């Protein structure tokens, strides 16, 4: 936007400079008549032209260009000029007087001075315009230079910003990669730790299970041993009891046998009382058979105990 405005201002002032310098023709007849009045032509012999032909004064009167004469000269000067006009128009009349020559010379000097002043003024205006144009051109160049510097600075800043962004992006990527690696390493360590813990737990469980199984087996063995001991003890008690029973039975049988042997003696006697005691003797052998049965039972129990051992 600044560049467009600077170019627009530059073109505008260039147009003004061209218009002031070349847009109007200096020192035309109309401008001279407007500045100095119609008498300028009369005093300088422009009425009939350089070759004495033409009627410039009448043309200016028709166009109304002689009105500025009232502003620059008094009425007395107009009357003198009218007399001079009559003298100039009448080319065939008497020669001009010295007074008219001196007046013409003064007017010519004044005209030259005015022309010099006008030229100086135009030159000053042109110089000012040139200086203004040069200053504007310098300002435009400075503005362009400043814009170029600003553009370079902006580009440098943008490049630095892009480099900083790229560096930040690279650092962020590297940080993410490092974090990912660290996370993977932590996960691997955690997984290894979990696996080790699980393995330890499994081993502990297996050991506990084995110990429990061994304990159960030991308890079972101990229970079996206790049962065997108890059974042995029971069998020993039973054997002792059987032996005691057998011994008691043997003693009883022995007593019965001793009592039974006396029976036949009774039969041999004549007394009835002795004869009646005979049948009791027959009961002795029966009890002896029961004793043999008890002996068989004790033998079986001993055999069973030996088998269990």
From Swiss-Prot:
Sequence ranges of Basic and acidic residues compositional bias: 93-259
Location (main, coarse): other
Composition bias, Acidic residues: 60-86
Domain of life of the organism encoding this protein: Eukaryota
Protein localization: Parasitophorous vacuole
Sequence repeats: 257-271, 272-286
Pfam families, per the entry: S-antigen
Composition bias type Gly residues, residue spans: 263-289
Positions of region (Disordered): 52-309
Chain positions covered by the region annotation 2 X 15 AA tandem repeats of S-E-A-G-T-E-G-P-K-G-T-G-G-P-G: 257-286
GO CC annotations, alphabetized: symbiont-containing vacuole
Keywords: Malaria, Repeat, Signal
Keyword Cell membrane in annotation: no
Region (20 X 8 AA approximate tandem repeats of A-[RL]-K-S-D-E-A-E): 97-256
Signal peptide: 1-23
Known function: S antigens are soluble heat-stable proteins present in the sera of some infected individuals.
Protein name: S-antigen protein
Organism for this UniProt entry: Plasmodium falciparum (isolate NF7 / Ghana)
Taxonomic classification: Eukaryota, Sar, Alveolata, Apicomplexa, Aconoidasida
């Amino acid at each position: 936007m600044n560049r467009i405005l600077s170019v627009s201002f530059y073109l505008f002032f260039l147009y003004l400079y061209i218009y002031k310098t070349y847009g109007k023709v200096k020192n035309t007849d109309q401008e001279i008549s407007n500045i100095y009045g119609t008498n300028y032509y009369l005093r300088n012999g422009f009425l009939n032209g350089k070759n004495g032909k033409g009627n410039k004064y009448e043309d200016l009167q028709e166009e109304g260009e002689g009105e500025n004469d009232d502003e620059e000269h008094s009425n007395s000067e107009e009357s003198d000029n009218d007399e001079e006009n009559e003298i100039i128009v009448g080319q065939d009349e008497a020669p001009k007087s010295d007074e008219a020559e001196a007046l013409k010379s003064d007017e010519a000097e004044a005209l030259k001075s005015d022309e010099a002043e006008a030229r100086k003024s135009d030159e000053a205006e042109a110089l000012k315009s040139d200086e203004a144009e040069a200053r504007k051109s310098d300002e435009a160049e400075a503005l362009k230079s400043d814009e170029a510097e600003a553009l370079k600075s902006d580009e440098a800043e943008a490049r630095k910003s892009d480099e900083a962004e790229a560096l930040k992006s690279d650092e962020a990527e590297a940080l993410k990669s490092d974090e990912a690696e660290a996370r993977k390493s932590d996960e691997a360590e955690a997984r290894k730790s979990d696996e080790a813990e699980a393995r330890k737990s499994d081993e502990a469980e297996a050991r506990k299970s084995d110990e429990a199984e061994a304990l159960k087996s030991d308890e079972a063995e101990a229970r079996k041993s206790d049962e065997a001991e108890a059974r042995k003890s029971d069998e020993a008690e039973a054997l002792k009891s059987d032996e005691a029973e057998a011994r008691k039975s043997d003693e009883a049988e022995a007593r019965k046998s001793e009592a039974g042997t006396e029976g036949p003696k009774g039969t041999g006697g004549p007394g009835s009382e002795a004869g009646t005691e005979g049948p009791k003797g027959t009961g002795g052998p029966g009890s002896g058979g029961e004793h043999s049965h008890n002996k068989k039972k004790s033998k079986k129990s001993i055999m069973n105990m030996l088998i269990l051992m």
